[in-house]
């Protein structure tokens, strides 16, 4: 279960969901476990003490003596390697030649062990990206089920990968396919995971406080494809330069985007008669045999020339229940991953039509006086809000603001100028948003609460418009979390409906 290590004494750093899962897993597999957390009494301590009575817990600042008699460090994804206390401990571990793994590395080692000892060889699909990970992961899992395979969906989406694997082993229900949603934090300490196919949906500014730079953030995302010699099929967004830079020569590459695909096996959008269609590029066997190959463009860097293609219509984009072209790209990525493991296309297309989306991700809430209200509370960074504005393709009254995490808000300027009727600002970084969006010429209105923001948005919106909560910011300045923020928004929309004599 632990590679060349034989039931090592494990130091688990951090006792969040992943930390508890790693402690459980290591204890279950015969390891001595020491758990350290900078908090003296983390919430999960009661579960650790109840489930793993032999585990040693040490609270407070990390010190080098935590490493005494340790053979493996298992680090939680919430701990940045740049934080001074954590960095000092990791450097000390390196000096002692103690390996440092994350939860997904433990999962990968376990899958390798199961294959070697019992022949269990599941297909593994992996998904990351700044935005759209959870929707794409959940959708991929649904499509696999629709195609008649058993599937384990885990990782950043919850449950943790190790908890899910433990449950499957205990119940003798190991799945045919694993679908893993992976954050950049999880990938930082993942080394041997070798998915059959993986995607990076997009890379925009986020988590720079954890990684230190965009280059480091993108490099962590690129780890999802595993060791180059394993030949992971890459599914990349051809309209995102940072993801296309991850393409490897000699590796099968499938791309997706909202433009027309130019290489066989890639996905895109064909607009015909005002209707957008999801399409698949196929070799055009009827093309003129004398036609000279064209130089390959940005959607496939693995070869020098392209063959002629025709575009097979798969389904109208409007047939998707999930709204917006950004969700159409998520759907294409999920479809590409499933086709990479040879699942039948017709079953997958039926699954796409049935999927209704995940909560708080451009989720329809109500229509009041011909104005639609959408909850995108999970839009906690600029890239998510840009995608939501562009994807809805309507006049929008945007509710934005919160804890900005030091982001650059300037990428919002163009979509706000194009789509917004007005922006209602809330939260700690409302001033920074106002400064960034001043050049748009759009009305910028302050609100002291989310309830007030809904009232003001309703007065600004016109028939056919959308009121969109897509904050581009974290929620912790005003709310417990993004779910609480969504609940307050939905409650305010319901009150608005009742005040106008409409049953929500």
UniProtKB/Swiss-Prot annotation:
Catalytic activity: UDP-N-acetyl-alpha-D-muramoyl-L-alanine + D-glutamate + ATP = UDP-N-acetyl-alpha-D-muramoyl-L-alanyl-D-glutamate + ADP + phosphate + H(+)
Superkingdom classification of source: Bacteria
EC number: 6.3.2.9
Cellular location(s): Cytoplasm
Alphabetized InterPro entries for the sequence: Folylpolyglutamate_synth_CS, Mur-like_cat_sf, Mur_ligase_C, Mur_ligase_C_dom_sf, Mur_ligase_cen, MurD
Keyword Nucleotide-binding attributed: yes
Alphabetized Gene3D superfamilies for the sequence: Mur ligase, C-terminal domain, Mur-like, catalytic domain, NAD(P)-binding Rossmann-like Domain
Disulfide bond entries: none
Positions contributing to ATP binding: 129-135
This protein's GO CC annotations: cytoplasm
HAMAP family: MurD
Protein name per Swiss-Prot or TrEMBL: UDP-N-acetylmuramoylalanine--D-glutamate ligase
């Amino acid at each position: 279960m632990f590679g060349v290590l034989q039931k090592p004494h494990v130091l688990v750093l951090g006792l969040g969901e992943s930390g508890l899962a790693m402690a459980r897993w290591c204890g279950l597999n015969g390891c001595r476990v020491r758990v350290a957390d900078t908090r003296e009494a983390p919430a999960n301590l009661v579960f650790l003490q109840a489930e793993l009575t032999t585990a040693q817990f040490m609270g407070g600042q990390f010190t080098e003596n935590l490493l005494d008699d340790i053979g493996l460090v298992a680090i939680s994804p919430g701990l940045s390697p740049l934080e001074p206390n954590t960095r000092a401990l990791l450097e000390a571990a390196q000096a002692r030649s103690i390996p440092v793994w994350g939860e997904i590395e433990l999962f990968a080692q376990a899958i390798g062990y199961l294959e070697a000892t019992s022949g269990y060889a599941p297909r593994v699909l992996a998904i990351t990206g700044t935005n759209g990970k959870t929707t794409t992961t959940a959708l991929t899992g649904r499509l696999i089920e629709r195609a008649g395979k058993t599937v384990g969906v885990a990782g950043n989406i919850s449950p943790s990968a190790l908890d899910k694997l433990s449950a499957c082993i205990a119940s003798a229900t190991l799945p045919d396919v694993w679908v893993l949603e992976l954050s950049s934090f999880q990938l930082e300490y993942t080394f041997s995971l070798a998915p059959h196919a993986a995607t990076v949906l997009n890379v925009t500014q986020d988590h720079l406080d954890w990684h230190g730079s965009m280059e480091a953030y993108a490099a962590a995302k690129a780890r999802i494809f595993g060791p180059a010699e394993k030949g992971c099929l890459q599914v990349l967004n051809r309209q995102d330069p940072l993801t296309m830079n991850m393409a490897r020569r000699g590796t099968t590459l499938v791309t997706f985007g909202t433009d027309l695909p130019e290489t066989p096996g890639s996905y895109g959008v064909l607009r015909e008669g005002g209707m957008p269609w999801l399409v698949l590029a196929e070799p055009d066997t009827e093309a003129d045999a004398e036609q000279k190959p064209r130089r390959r463009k940005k959607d496939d860097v693995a070869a020098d020339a392209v063959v002629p293609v025709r575009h097979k219509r798969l389904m109208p984009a409007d047939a998707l229940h999930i709204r917006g072209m950004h969700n159409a790209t998520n759907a294409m990525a999920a479809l590409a991953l499933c086709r990479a493991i040879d699942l039948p296309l017709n079953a997958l297309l039926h699954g796409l039509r049935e999927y209704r989306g995940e909560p708080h991700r451009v989720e329809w809430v109500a229509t009041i006086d011909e104005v639609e209200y959408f909850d995108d509370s999970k839009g906690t960074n600029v890239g998510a809000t840009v995608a939501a504005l562009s994807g809805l393709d309507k006049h929008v009254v945007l509710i934005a603001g919160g804890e900005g995490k030091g982001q650059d808000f300037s990428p919002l300027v163009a979509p706000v100028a194009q789509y917004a009727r007005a922006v209602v600002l809330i939260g700690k970084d409302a001033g920074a948003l106002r400064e960034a969006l001043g050049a748009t010429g759009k009305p910028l209105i302050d609100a002291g609460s989310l309830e007030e923001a809904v009232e003001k948005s309703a007065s600004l919106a016109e028939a056919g418009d959308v009121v969109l909560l897509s904050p581009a910011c974290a929620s912790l300045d005003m709310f417990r979390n993004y779910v609480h923020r969504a609940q307050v928004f939905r409650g305010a929309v319901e009150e608005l409906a009742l005040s106008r004599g409409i049953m929500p």
